[in-house]
């Protein structure tokens, strides 16, 4: 176990939109430290998003990510030989990172098109409350609801 709590690092905002959330999305898309490629992908996806939603790209991105953010999740807890899936509220920073992770995973799981297009499509779906990332959120919520009986095991 750690001696003290891990320090939360501040992510600098991205150069074009001057927004921390866009910067986090870029870092999530990035592979092998190739940030400039990740930036191109995200900025093209943002253009695609604003084109499809007819809204400001930043506003649309924030809305899409808010739609995917989970409220509760389940965590395993061992109680006397049995492992229970205990529903727990998700902390604020984790909500955002889970939403970003699910959106990028959903985009990567699609085949046959450029990543910018797939990410843009997934962001549009998230904005409209449809798509794979929203389905993932609903699955997590359903799992928490099914295990609500074990909520008293919270720590």
Curated annotation (Swiss-Prot):
Matching Pfam families: Ribosomal_S7
Key word tRNA-binding present: yes
Record keywords: Ribonucleoprotein, Ribosomal protein, RNA-binding, rRNA-binding, tRNA-binding
Transmembrane segments: none
Presence of keyword RNA-binding: yes
CDD domains hit by this protein: uS7_Bacteria (cd14869)
Assigned GO CC terms: small ribosomal subunit
Organism superkingdom: Bacteria
InterPro entries: Ribosomal_uS7 (IPR000235), Ribosomal_uS7_bac/org-type (IPR005717), Ribosomal_uS7_CS (IPR020606), Ribosomal_uS7_dom (IPR023798), Ribosomal_uS7_dom_sf (IPR036823)
GO BP term, pick one: translation
Gene3D superfamilies reported for this sequence: Ribosomal protein S7 domain
SUPFAM superfamilies referenced in this protein's UniProt entry, alphabetically: Ribosomal protein S7
GO molecular function: rRNA binding; structural constituent of ribosome; tRNA binding
Assembly mode: Part of the 30S ribosomal subunit. Contacts proteins S9 and S11.
Matching PANTHER family: RIBOSOMAL PROTEIN S7
Protein task: One of the primary rRNA binding proteins, it binds directly to 16S rRNA where it nucleates assembly of the head domain of the 30S subunit. Is located at the subunit interface close to the decoding center, probably blocks exit of the E-site tRNA.
Protein family membership: Belongs to the universal ribosomal protein uS7 family.
Name of the molecule in the record: Small ribosomal subunit protein uS7
Organism for this UniProt entry: Thermosipho africanus (strain TCF52B)
